[in-house]
Amino acid sequence: MAFDRVDLLPMTQLLVGPARYGGTTVPGIRIGGERLVGSRTIMRRLDELTPEPSLLPAPEDPARAQVLEIERWGDEELQDVPRAILPRAFIRKPAVMESFVGDDVNLPLPRAMLRPSLPLTARLMAIRSKTTDETARASIAGLPEQLDRVDAWIADGLLGGDRPNAADLQIGSTIRLLMAIADVHPLIAGRPAAKLTRYFPPMVGEVPAGTLPAEWQPAPARG
């Protein structure tokens, strides 16, 4: 499917999102006069426009309801983990934010002009996400149990197939982002959940080791 990608700087979606695609969060999409917000809504619409290959099991397949529930969990719960951690990391090292901007991103201003705004942007992201050091640390502490659930779904054949389904894309994108945080990476590496990143291109940015306090750092994943 042909498309045009529009890159937005962090927080600017609050200003331009309503006019462009009808919301203040990302992702958003505009198809003609139709405006859609949110990954699940967008994937359902894309499935309607391009039915094959489908992102969901057939309607008569009992696995369909399970995949939809896993997708919901990934969107509403697992996705909150990087949302809690990344702003606190960026506050500590604002310059790290620039590493997540690939060479193919169309910025409205030269990078040198944007750099002075990075510390403020990081703090605004934390306010927007309602995250504190305590919530970030708690999110890391709860991640192993969440990864256990993902590993179990892979073992049951609901995730990790040869062709990704909607839940693979929802959860795999979050896993990929979490693995870009070097202090969190060891918690995921070696798990079946880590293999869900294969559906995506390599991550551009990285939060280097030592950005988060040492007492937050997770224990290595099980062998």
Predicted regions and their residues:
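GST-like domain detector, emphasizing the conserved glutathione-binding G-site
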Residues: M1-L107
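Generic alpha-helical structural signal
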Residues: L68, P144-D148, T197
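Extended hydrophobic/aromatic segments used for targeting, binding, or gating
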Residues: A167-G223
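GST-like fold's C-terminal all-alpha helical module
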Residues: Q79-A189
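Short alpha-helical hairpin
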Residues: G17, T121-A122, P220
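Short secondary-structure transition/capping segments
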Residues: T50-R64, D103-L114, T131-D133, P202-W216
